């Protein structure tokens, strides 16, 4: 085996080409440069900092799109910068402060090729052939070595080992043949975000067929779409809500948000239809619709009521907590939690949607990222400190406590629809009896801050142990003093305890 390894090493060295000094990779310069930043990905920033600056030009639907920016890590832009210009895209890279200010990428003139492009393709071809040759040699030698090793150790195997001692092969499929579940499972190990890689996102987005509009609002429309026979939800943002689209895209692509009680993100894309730009956010499709719609049509038993509220609490706890490590996430506060932003799944659980107003916080850097969205939350669900403008806007915990207030109101909405002793209330939104259908900021401030009113708890709740516990829990979410409110994790544990006691009661019966 030692001789075989030595032979393999020699053959690998012979197979791989030895690049000349001028072809060697430049050493990565750890220095960061200030670069001009222009384009959608920059948000409101006009500069960025990275190890390489770039200027790019691409042709999209006949329009030329110019962008400038930076690669924060040198390796990130290595292949992009080496790729020769094509008729549809060109990238120019440089190193130095503001070096891309006066650099403009140019598309190749028809019939001309850029210097070095032929050499580049020749080098790439040689490298590919060499690697293929080396891999074939390696496979042959490994096969011979394994056969010898297996023959030499065959007598040590017991009958069961002989029967099941096979080597698993790797099965590959074309990207176009993959299901969304397979693509998303693979993406968990290929990046820090919770969606697909950017190139796959664009591919998926452009293969979607819109089937029917399932919802409209101030933000835009939600459509049921189809991708290779699978249903997806396509949220099409209006141009005035561009910042919400950008914020959700940013969150999903930078934070590992995958959780059964957070709406599953698939892709995000900017596309052109009917001579206008559309902003798409593509997510999992839940045919049951929003919790708001579901509660108007459906009454709940104790089990389904607890399943709904516990799943919402689990999703909120996952958002609020910071997870450390390579597969970790920043702490996030939702800021617009309400029954219309919660979707009902087929299994009776719920998932939290619409992160357009979310706030992020990282303990390691102590940075609070509130985004750049002028949109405000829903007035009916606003906490007292938001209405009277006493909220500490530079403190992340303040935003989490605002979410807890809103969760208490959602809990009240759900509990009203739970049947006990044959009695159930009609669905009503919070404060339906004291403010108009579309309350103003001042309407809510008077009711919540001045009069300190809270949603009414029906007397019949106190004859049911589950509703009694839920009533106590929601009151602890509605304290006027934000710091006295429960945390999402405490709520989740309390609801789990209530759920477990119900299971125990059933077992005893």
UniProtKB/Swiss-Prot annotation:
It comes from the Eukaryota. It is found in: Membrane. Its cofactor is Mg(2+); Mn(2+). GO terms for biological process: activin receptor signaling pathway; acute inflammatory response; atrial septum primum morphogenesis; atrioventricular valve morphogenesis; BMP signaling pathway; branching involved in blood vessel morphogenesis; cardiac muscle cell fate commitment; cell differentiation. Residues 1-20 form the signal peptide. InterPro entries: Activin_recp (IPR000472), GS_dom (IPR003605), Kinase-like_dom_sf (IPR011009), Prot_kinase_dom (IPR000719), Protein_kinase_ATP_BS (IPR017441), Ser-Thr/Tyr_kinase_cat_dom (IPR001245), Ser/Thr_kinase_AS (IPR008271), Snake_toxin-like_sf (IPR045860). Residues 21-123 are extracellular. ATP binds at residues 214-222, 235. Disulfide bonds: none annotated. Residues 178-207 form the GS domain. Urogenital ridge, testis, ovary, brain and lungs. It catalyses: L-threonyl-[receptor-protein] + ATP = O-phospho-L-threonyl-[receptor-protein] + ADP + H(+); L-seryl-[receptor-protein] + ATP = O-phospho-L-seryl-[receptor-protein] + ADP + H(+). One of its GO terms (cellular component) is apical part of cell. Its EC number is 2.7.11.30. The modification Phosphoserine is found at residue 501. Keywords: ATP-binding, Glycoprotein, Kinase, Magnesium, Manganese, Membrane, Metal-binding, Nucleotide-binding, Phosphoprotein, Receptor, Serine/threonine-protein kinase, Signal, Transferase, Transmembrane, Transmembrane helix. The active site is at residue 336. Its main location: membrane. Glycans are attached at residue 102. It is a single-pass type I membrane protein. GO terms for molecular function: activin binding; activin receptor activity, type I; ATP binding; BMP receptor activity; cadherin binding; growth factor binding; metal ion binding; protein homodimerization activity. Belongs to the protein kinase superfamily. TKL Ser/Thr protein kinase family. TGFB receptor subfamily. Bone morphogenetic protein (BMP) type I receptor that is involved in a wide variety of biological processes, including bone, heart, cartilage, nervous, and reproductive system development and regulation. As a type I receptor, forms heterotetrameric receptor complexes with the type II receptors AMHR2, ACVR2A ors ACVR2B. Upon binding of ligands such as BMP7 or GDF2/BMP9 to the heteromeric complexes, type II receptors transphosphorylate ACVR1 intracellular domain. In turn, ACVR1 kinase domain is activated and subsequently phosphorylates SMAD1/5/8 proteins that transduce the signal. This is Activin receptor type-1. It comes from Rattus norvegicus. The lineage of its organism: Eukaryota, Metazoa, Chordata, Craniata, Vertebrata.
């Amino acid at each position: 085996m030692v001789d075989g390894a030595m032979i393999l090493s020699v053959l690998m060295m012979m197979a791989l080409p030895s690049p000349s000094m001028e072809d060697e990779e430049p050493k990565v310069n750890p220095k960061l440069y200030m670069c001009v930043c222009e384009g959608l990905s920059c948000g409101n920033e006009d500069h960025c900092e990275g190890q390489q600056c770039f200027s790019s030009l691409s042709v999209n639907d006949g329009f030329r799109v110019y962008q400038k920016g930076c690669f924060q890590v040198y390796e990130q832009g290595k292949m992009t910068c080496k790729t020769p210009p094509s008729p549809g895209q060109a990238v120019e890279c440089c190193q130095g402060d503001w070096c891309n200010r006066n650099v403009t990428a140019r598309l190749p003139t028809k019939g001309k090729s850029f210097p070095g492009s032929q050499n580049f393709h020749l080098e790439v071809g040689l490298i590919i052939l060499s690697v293929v040759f080396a891999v074939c040699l390696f496979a042959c030698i490994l096969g011979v070595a394994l056969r010898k090793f297996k023959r030499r150790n065959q007598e040590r195997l017991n009958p069961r080992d002989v029967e099941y001692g096979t080597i698993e092969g790797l099965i590959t499929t074309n990207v176009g043949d993959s299901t969304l579940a397979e693509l998303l499972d693979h993406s968990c190990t290929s990046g820090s975000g919770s969606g697909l890689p950017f190139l796959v996102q664009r591919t998926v987005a452009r293969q979607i067929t819109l089937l029917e509009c399932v919802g409209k609002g101030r933000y835009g429309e939600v459509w049921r779409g189809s991708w290779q026979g699978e249903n997806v939800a396509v949220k099409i943002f209006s141009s005035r809500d561009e910042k919400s689209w950008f914020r959700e895209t940013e969150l999903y692509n930078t934070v590992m948000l995958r959780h059964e009680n957070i709406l599953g993100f698939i892709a995000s894309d900017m596309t052109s239809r009917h001579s206008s730009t559309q902003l798409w956010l593509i997510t999992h499709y839940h045919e049951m619709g929003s919790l708001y719609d579901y509660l108007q049509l459906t009454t709940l038993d104790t089990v389904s009521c607890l399943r709904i509220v516990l799943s919402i609490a689990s999703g909120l706890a996952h958002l609020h907590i910071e997870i450390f490590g390579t597969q970790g996430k920043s702490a996030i506060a939702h800021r617009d939690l309400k029954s219309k932003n919660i979707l009902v799944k087929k299994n009776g659980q719920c998932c939290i949607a619409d992160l357009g107003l979310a706030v992020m916080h990282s303990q390691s850097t102590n940075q609070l990222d509130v985004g750049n969205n002028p949109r405000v939350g829903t007035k009916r669900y606003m906490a007292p400190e938001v209405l009277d403008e006493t909220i500490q806007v530079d403190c992340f915990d303040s935003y989490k406590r605002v979410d807890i207030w809103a969760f208490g109101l959602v809990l009240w909405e759900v509990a009203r629809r739970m049947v006990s002793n044959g009695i159930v209330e009609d669905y009503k939104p919070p404060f339906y009896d004291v403010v108009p259908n579309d309350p103003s900021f001042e309407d809510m401030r008077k009711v919540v801050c001045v009069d300190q009113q809270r949603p009414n708890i029906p007397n019949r709740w106190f004859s049911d142990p589950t509703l009694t516990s839920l009533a106590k829990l929601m009151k602890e979410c509605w304290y006027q003093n934000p710091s006295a409110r429960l945390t999402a994790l405490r709520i989740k544990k309390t609801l789990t305890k209530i759920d477990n006691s119900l299971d125990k009661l059933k077992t005893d019966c």
